[in-house]
Design a protein with these regions (language model features):
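Gram-negative bacterial Sec-dependent N-terminal signal peptides
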Residues: 1-27
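Hydrophobic alpha-helical segments and their boundary regions
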Residues: 5-8, 13, 50, 231-233, ...
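Outer-membrane beta-barrel porins/channels
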Residues: 27-40, 44, 116-461
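N-terminal, post-signal peptide beta-strand-biased segments of exported outer-membrane/organellar beta-barrel
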Residues: 23-134, 138, 172, 396, ...
Length: 461
């Protein structure tokens, strides 16, 4: 029997690659990760693109590498403890005669604990190349991980969402004068995506005029088909490799003031992989003639956003420094994601996101208590790119506030050990009212926040 194409498109729609970029371990707005420097995190990222002595400038502003006098290697690890829980209810076949409450719980703790590592190297050259400094860094600029219970009330909107971007950045800086340097870098980015959700085949069958009669045999209560009675499952996996670039400038108008600007390019990805469908045995014959909902290859194109960052560090005294940072992230690159399948009978699916550009602002400071210990703190506001009409169970995003503390122990002339704690919380309670065109509606709100614990070691040769 021919099942409506509209149901086919909508059922798989929730599996869009962009939907996987929704919420979770991402601890900056959208699916951005800023956890590339324990020192900078201790100031809520203030001064990340202008402060000296932090090898993560390879990606935060490669021009600052010119201020390094020694070859430096740095390893950072941040543990993200995300608390993320839904409160609300849902309706299957909303607005139709078959309407009924969605079964299932709140999905459990959708967050969890995840580690974000970073490794950086800065190498100042000597002799005739003394104005040139090289750098390399492995980092994760974007990512998320959320896992709901398989039978939760919002299972038709999303169950598992994993997205990982890993960058290898090779950079160089040139000192044009004692006060001014420029830097540039090439980015090789690897992306992996896994996402899944349940499919309410029962509602689709009952909503299609050609198969509605199956829902009333022998009656609407005991019939073989109906909303929530014939759930299937779908999982999409994909990978991609692509290239990007960044440039930076660092102006030091005095010995106490450092100003930085950094631009990171968009990176275009063609994520390709597989779409795997689990279809109930009593549903399979209905779709047999259509050739749909069978395992196939597929993928989607998406673009990670560009960023513009302004940074300032002012050494107010020999012991005290103030920092500030402002970053504009070009989330308007995420307007629509269209999934194309290798199976010619599986129609493309598309979803509008229409994200908006967003700002991140932070201020912070450092106090050098002694030759051995430096303390730091900072606060930040991270605006969400997601407006309420586009907020979903995969992205119940909201403006966020950062509250950060950190310290560095200079164990020797060559070795620094740093640690931080950051509390990230929503500026307001994110509410969702999601109506899927396949029939289900999810209404509720999210309680969420995150605790970040970071540790790093820096060694100067």
């Amino acid at each position: 029997m021919q099942v409506a194409t509209r149901f086919t498109q909508v059922s798989v729609l929730a599996l869009g690659i962009a939907a996987a970029m929704a919420s979770g371990q991402a601890q900056a707005a959208g699916f951005q990760l800023k956890e590339n420097s324990v020192k900078a995190q201790g100031r809520a990222m203030a001064g990340a693109g202008s402060a000296q002595g932090d090898a993560s400038v390879v990606v935060n502003n490669p021009a600052v590498m010119s201020t390094f006098a020694r070859t430096t290697v740095q390893a950072d690890v941040t543990a993200i403890d995300l608390s993320f829980e839904f409160r609300g209810s849902g309706t299957a076949a909303a607005g139709s005669p078959l309407q009924q409450p969605l079964s299932g719980g709140n999905g459990g703790q959708a967050g969890g604990l995840a580690a974000v590592p970073a490794l950086s190297l800065v190498v100042p050259l000597q002799d005739r190349f003394e104005y040139l400094t090289l750098g390399a860094m492995v980092s994760a600029p974007f990512g998320l991980a959320t896992h709901y219970d398989h039978d939760w009330v919002g299972r038709y909107h999303g169950v598992e969402s994993d997205l990982v971007f890993v960058d290898l950045t090779l950079a160089a800086s040139v000192e044009l004068s004692d006060r001014f340097s420029v830097g540039f870098g090439a980015i090789y980015e690897h992306a992996e995506a896994t996402l899944s959700n349940a499919i309410d085949f029962g509602t689709g069958i009952c909503a299609n005029p050609q198969t509605t009669s199956l829902c009333f045999l022998p009656n609407p209560v005991q019939g073989p088909y109906g909303p929530q009675r014939n759930d299937g499952f779908a999982t999409i996996n994909g990978t991609s490799n692509s290239l990007g670039w960044l440039v930076g400038m660092n102006w030091r108008p005095s010995d106490r003031l450092s100003l930085g600007y950094t631009y990171r390019s968009e990176i275009d990805h063609e994520i390709r992989g597989s779409a795997d469908f689990t279809v109930p045995a009593n549903v399979t014959p209905i779709f047999a003639s259509t050739g749909q909902f069978v395992d196939t290859g597929g993928g989607a194109d998406l673009t990670t956003p560009s960023t513009h960052s302004l940074s300032a560090t002012w050494q107010a005294s020999d012991r005290f420094a103030l920092m500030a940072e402002a970053t504009l992230t070009g989330w308007d690159s995420l307007e629509e994601v269209r999934i194309q399948y290798e199976n010619p009978r599986q129609p493309d699916t598309a979803e509008d996101y229409l994200w908006e550009d967003s700002w991140f602002y932070s201020v912070g400071g450092e106090y050098r208590f002694s030759d051995s210990f430096t303390f730091r703190a900072g606060v930040a506001r991270d605006d969400s790119p997601v407006s309420r009409p586009f907020r979903s169970s995969r992205l119940p995003d909201q403006d966020r506030m950062w509250y950060a503390l950190g310290l560095t122990w200079s164990a020797s002339e060559r070795l620094d050990i740093s640690a931080n704690y950051v509390r990230i919380q929503m500026a307001d309670t994110p509410e969702v009212d999601i109506r899927s065109t396949s029939g289900s509606r999810l209404v509720g709100e999210y309680d969420g926040g995150a605790d970040l614990y970071g540790i790093s070691a820096q060694y100067r040769f």
